[in-house]
Amino acid sequence: MQVLTILHQSLYQHCPEIHQKRLNTLMVACKALINADCLTLTHLGRHIDGTSTHTKHSIKRMDRLLGNPHLHHERMAVYQWHAKWLLTAHTMPTILVDWSDMREGRELIALRASIAIKGRSITLYERTFPLVLQGTQTAHNQFLNELRKVLPDNITPLIVTDAGFRNPWFRKVEQLGWYWLGRVRGLSVYRPHPFGRQFSLKALYPQARRRAKHVGRVALSVKKPLLCEMVLFRAPSKGRKGLRSTTTDCHHTAQWTYELTAKEPWALVTNLTMEAMSPQKLVNIYQKRM
């Protein structure tokens, strides 16, 4: 298959850290994935082509590959090559970061950085954490430090996140010399900078319109205020109706929470200046998350 040949040659040329035998087995796993169309250990083992080996031994072969500590160490080189290939023409790429559930068991959760290209999300870097570390500063700092090693040195990315990422995340991103764009919700408090009394975000919502509005430079939070620019925007209603089947617990309270969240205006915050990027452009960038 031509695509596997190109992939093998690229990894052989740009990732010399990977041992030849491990690289060959990795290509066997890639071909098995294409044949199986399902990424599980047993499916990979059962769909290895061109071998007379018993299925049990093929599954064990995939198990050894996935658990190989050398391959886990060498995967950083693959991420670096992939990021360099994707971002070579971008000096300030927009990188979307979010948590993603691991469906089996819910013991692990993935934190993923991706780039949106022509309506499609392509992963730049991801790693898993125990579920108890979801949203913690420990996980965020570790992820950002590893992401810095993956990205080329000559770029300054714009990191886009949802309302689950707060001031400690923004400070860490800024410490790395990057730009950030996020959303604040709920009981977040701000005050106009440099002088002004404190306001709740909900007091701003009536001012939101379909045209993005620059609120101004604000100090976010009270105890450890973070200076940033704030943009307010209300997206037009999409006319969606809650028509879930009664067999899928359509009366669960979470449904009403999701509906209220979808109707809330966007309060976006960033360390970019309005001269560098207009309010409407910031809204357009944030919409790439959807």
Predicted segments with their positions:
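Residues within the helices of the helix-turn-helix
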Residues: 42
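Nucleic-acid substrate recognition interfaces
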Residues: 34, 50, 68
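Single, function-defining residue in the core of a domain
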Residues: 1-38, 46, 77-78, 90-93, ...
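Short, basic interhelical loop/turn and adjoining N-cap
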Residues: 48-61
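Active-site-proximal, Lys/Arg-enriched surface segment
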Residues: 59-118
